[in-house]
Amino acid sequence: MFESKNQDNKQDNLSCILSCLNQCDRVTIPEKKWYRARVINEDDADIVYDGMGNPLRGYLSDKSGVAPAKYISSGRANDRYEQVLYIAEDEETAQKEARADEGRYVSVASCNFQNDMVLMDFSPYTEEQLSDYANTNFSDSQLNTYMFTQIQKILTMPEYSEKEYIISRTLVKCIKENMDVSGILYISHFTGKKNMAIWDDNKFIKFTDGCLKLA
């Protein structure tokens, strides 16, 4: 998936990755308000438009969550048509992560989690946080510390094309297949705030109606 420090073969790389993942923190979703942004598609049947073709409102609550499979392109943690829900800890981060072209409309909704969904935590971000995390989780292995920082970089990189997401999707597939978690917690390159990607039971998460924003 990515080169190890000693250039071992892919199987050894996978073993190193799994060793690191097994020592990463599992966390439940903090019970606070989280935000979801969806770029509004042209001629979307779920949107009301004015006579000039501009949307009059955002998506209603039942459409503010994970998008229909037909609208989903490959992303950081999902293949094309795969319904992974991306949300952020504040409105600004949600909008930036949606990466809407200038002049496009975005619908921003919020939700409050009250469940025991478990995520793998890649969010320690500052030098002090990373040092504390490494000393606690990886005190027996400098290699695992190195692997964690590489995984975190892959999940945070501000990639834009579907093709460039191959590495992060391969990593997330490894997590899905080998770790008993429902998603990941990671850092936004744009704001340094937390994002979540949730692949289990994401259609049952309730959102507010979306507010209309212009990118």
Outline where the language-model segments fall.
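Short active-site loop/helix that positions an aromatic residue
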Residues: 91-102
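Active-site and NAD+-binding cores of ADP-ribose-processing enzymes
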Residues: 1-78, 100-215
